[in-house]
Amino acid sequence: MSKKVLIVTGDAVEALEIYYPYYRLLEEDFDVTIAAPKKKKLHTVVHDFADWDTFVEKPGYLIDAHASFAEIDPTQYDALIIPGGRAPEYIRLDENLPKIVRHFFEANKPVAAICHASLVLETLPDIMKGRSMTAYIACKPGVEAIGANYVSEPTHVDNNFVSAHAWPDLPAFMREFIKLLNK
């Protein structure tokens, strides 16, 4: 039986950070569910690193959320991915999401978080305290505020937890995550 992976996100998810993991997991024959605050078509955004001091944002593609957070029973899944973009800014406020994420850490299941996904993890300081991770550099203060150790690496693995800076790091991020899934 194929392993089941849950991706949690919402509108304004970074396009590459959802599409690359989604299709990479399907390619490996995993069963993948995308969940969001509401079951709907999600609007993605493209974050690019132009000649600015920060990233720029453009509209991206649409992608279906297969389920709402309220419909998710995390015990039915083997692993979790949290993409970045701006979605983490508001999905972390959904009362169901911290419970979902907590389950994966407490059950020691593989968890992957990229870029601004660390904003979701800020809702679980008791889980993150003492863990090491990386994230988009602008998220470093939030990572440190919850007691996690920010690591200046493009991709980092801390036991069952894989984290990465941003979409340019997706190949290593997914390689490490799939290694955890195949253990």
Where are these regions (language model features)?
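Extended, subdomain-level signal for the structured scaffold at the beginning of enzyme domains
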Residues: M1-A107, L119-S132, K140-K183
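Short, thiol/selenol-centered motifs that function as redox-active sites or metal-ligating centers
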Residues: I114-A117
